[in-house]
Amino acid sequence: VHVAHLDHGLRPDSADDAQFVAGIAREWGFAISIERRDVAAIAAKRRLSLEEAGREARYTFLAEVAQEEHVNLIMVGHNADDQVETVLMHLLRGAGMGGLRGMRPLTPMAAMHLATATPVPAELRLGRPLLPVTRAEIEAYCNEHRLQPRQDASNAETTFLRNQLRHEVLPLLESVNPNLRAALRRMAAVFTEDHRVLQQATRAAWEQVVARR
């Protein structure tokens, strides 16, 4: 296991977060890579939102560390509640079937078209092992095993769309349908299977109509 942490430089205490992660890595005997990138400058230069710039900087950093360490699997901590927020966000943006599947348990990093110094290898994957697990279940596990996670204060700010959905929109929708989160996860699973079948049928039809020379 090799731990990687990117300091986005967006909060005064972000350096403390990096030190917290470094301390845990040392305690557990893991090697670690820590870097700071100016996400605000990236956003301004490329005319991206802070969310978009942060995502690109984060995954570019992780892909670069993976290549330096000669590994082909990156694992991140997205959970079932993150999935619900992602599906709802894609729905609001008018995404098609591909987007309404939500996040995938395993994603080829090359498909993310990152601005890495060298091309991302085809075999490099992004894994999300906690995708079936809810945030409440993760917090219960931490309490049971006396693990003290560090909270990102920016998660409480509703200036970001994801946080607005988490703190304002989802609670309102759940007042109408208390089972909304489960319903959105089921919808994502249905779209995932539909997308798989359509892709399979498309490939089969392509083989029939395209002549190879």
Name each model feature, range by range:
Residues 1-171:
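Core alpha/beta nucleotide-donor-binding catalytic domains of modification enzymes
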Residues 109, 116-124, 159-213:
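ATP/NTP-dependent adenylation/nucleotidyl-transfer catalytic domains that generate, transfer
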